[in-house]
Amino acid sequence: MLFRSFGDKCEFSGLGALTEFFSSVPQAVQERWPFDLSDKGYRTFYEQALIVSEQLGFVSRLHLRARITKGEETYAVSRKICFEDDKMVFVHDSLRREKGAAGANFAHLLMARTRDFLQAYDQIRKICYKNEHSEIFVQARSAPKGKIPVYGGYIWANQGFDFRDKSDLPRFRDRFRSFLSAHGVKITDKDLKRFTRPCHFAAFGCGIQVADDNGNGVHLGKAFMLEQTWFGRWSTENPRAEEKRYAEAYNREGIPHASRRRQAVAVLNENYKN
């Protein structure tokens, strides 16, 4: 392991940085490490494991890059993990499929393991106003027309994330209203106010389909989210939040892909029967 010091900062690099960073985390929690997917047949190759500690601010961050492979599948993952007092924060920078066909739902597998890790960690510590619930932050980025298409705006909406900053919601609703209008659909102010979480926009459908970049017909909610970039937040707090129950239904094992949205929408409808 390499150690370097730069004034009020110091760095540890190498695989030993993983052990160093999580040295205060109980072994039972470490065993749930989300990058270990060997039980699913995946192998993880770490390309960067770097701790940056700001000695004056008592901030410690682990910068992590890895490639995770299984047969013909290869995924490149980049994350930062921070300790803020006792709270742990995962900042998901990027997930890119480099090889293999779409449809493996690897994003769900990796995020589910991360949630499980944080939930196990929070169960062994005291949560209070000084030590808040652990979190995951993600930039749900979409760039469908880029050289390497990115569809995070829709993918992460189905993984239990809420908007990180609720002040962005009015602008998001305005874009949604304009998008629907362009496709001949009018929505009332009353109905639009029901859209409060990313999964609400992603789930919307009224029988109209539009072609995505691959020429496939998709429902309006998916078409809209495939063009959006937003910042998401997931917390161990309130495990039965609507967006989390939606994700649980959407990603349930054994459900055909074509039925996922229908199953998840049924969860949303439970809240709006009246």
Segments and roles (model prediction):
Residues G7-S60, R65, T69:
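Extended, charge-biased low-complexity segments
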Residues S5, A17, F21-S24, A28, ...:
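Charge-rich, solvent-exposed alpha-helical interaction surfaces
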Residues A101-C128:
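Conserved acetyl-CoA-binding loop-helix of GNAT-fold acetyltransferases
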Residues R125-I148:
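Conserved GNAT acetyl-CoA-binding A-motif
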Residues K166-N274:
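Intrinsically disordered, low-complexity, charge-dense segments enriched in Lys/Arg
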Residues M1-L2:
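Short, small-residue-biased leader/transition segments that mark boundaries at the very start
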Residues A140-D168:
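Conserved active-site alpha-helix within GNAT-family acetyltransferase domains
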Residues A76-R79, D86-L109, Q139, Y154:
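Conserved acetyl-CoA binding element of GNAT-fold acetyltransferases
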